[in-house]
Amino acid sequence: MGESERIPVGIIGASGYGGVQLVRLLLEHPQVEIAYLGGKGSAGKPYWDLYPHLSHLVNLTVEPIDLEVVASRCQVVFLGLPNGLACDMAPQLIAKGCKVLDLSADYRFRDLQTYTAWYNKDRSDTETAAKAVYGLPELYRTEIQSASLIGCPGCYPTASLMALSPLLKQGLILPETAIIDAKSGTSGGGRQEKIHLLLAEAEGSLGAYGVAKHRHTPEIEQVCSDLAGHEVKVQFTPHLIPMVRGILSTVYASLRDPGLVRDDILTIYSAFYRSSPFVKILPHGIYPQTKWAWGTNLCYIGIETDPRTDRVIVLSAIDNLMKGQAGQAVQCLNLMMGWEETLGLPQLSFYP
């Protein structure tokens, strides 16, 4: 495909870590060209002023957010905005013929009352929200292919659901016993100035936050309920760890059949994800490490059973900025456009 045939795409909210990760991926994607970078606080600045390491590749200036301009230039728009802003823009962009991928929480929920309860914003875009597809390709690949609006999952839900989904879909566990212990690097908190993300605060320290009230909880529960066929509640506790990238999610649950052994579960997981090119099921006795996924769109999954407690333990590792954010959005873009799912997405990590 020649340069003139590339699909023009735009990013509104390009100044954050998710935005710059999108820029990196789209620059190397053979089917797209970046036609617009937009923002509010950074409007008027050359993009290389925000990220000098891209000065030799990106000559664009961050522009004020003007949806008429965006729609006139772009067939596809990524929204990398704080929660509560995309829902004001997506309906207009879709009405103008754009495909939209939202990286915030605005279009992740089927029930907008749940969104309002957890994100404290009333919504009037019910019709648009009803068209949104949850952007986890391993579960909703077919729906994504025909969608015009994608609600890209959060980083914690991605890692957690990749670990939990086969257990729930196949009825292998007692759903009410599911516990998720997840740990994330500091880039998940964004690029804004936050005291707890300062090196002096985060280095050498490990702590939980959002205990019993993290906003990703209802998102996880919505998909778990879909898979189980009835309402499911999970115990989810996130932790901040002193590294930049990565999420390790450890899921514990009681087996419905205590006689089920690890090798049986490994076989079930391998079959469940057999058509998922980014999921790597590890052999028994090998457990995932976040470093393996750095800079890639991969998800590594390790499995163990504990016959003493009749529980299964599933661990998943992803790069929170890739499979947990920008990489997964590009994966969804590929499916929406009918391209190879892996197109433009790295599968080789930074190592060591």
Curated annotation (Swiss-Prot):
A Gene Ontology molecular function term of the record: NADP+ binding
Keywords: Amino-acid biosynthesis, Arginine biosynthesis, Cytoplasm, NADP, Oxidoreductase
Catalytic residues as annotated in Swiss-Prot or TrEMBL: C155
A GO cellular component annotation in the UniProt record: cytoplasm
Record field: catalytic activity: N-acetyl-L-glutamate 5-semialdehyde + phosphate + NADP(+) = N-acetyl-L-glutamyl 5-phosphate + NADPH + H(+)
Cross-referenced CDD domains: AGPR_1_C, AGPR_1_N
Enzyme Commission code(s) on record: 1.2.1.38
Record InterPro entries: AGPR_AS, AGPR_type-1, NAD(P)-bd_dom_sf, NAGSA_dehydrogenase, Semialdehyde_DH_NAD-bd
UniProt GO BP: L-arginine biosynthetic process
Enzyme class at the top of the EC tree: oxidoreductase
Pfam families assigned to the protein according to its UniProt record, in alphabetical order: Semialdhyde_dh, Semialdhyde_dhC_1
Pathway noted in the entry: Amino-acid biosynthesis; L-arginine biosynthesis; N(2)-acetyl-L-ornithine from L-glutamate: step 3/4
Subcellular location as annotated: Cytoplasm
NCBIfam families (alphabetical): argC
Record's function text: Catalyzes the NADPH-dependent reduction of N-acetyl-5-glutamyl phosphate to yield N-acetyl-L-glutamate 5-semialdehyde.
Family: Belongs to the NAGSA dehydrogenase family. Type 1 subfamily.
Name of this chain's protein: N-acetyl-gamma-glutamyl-phosphate reductase
Gene label: argC
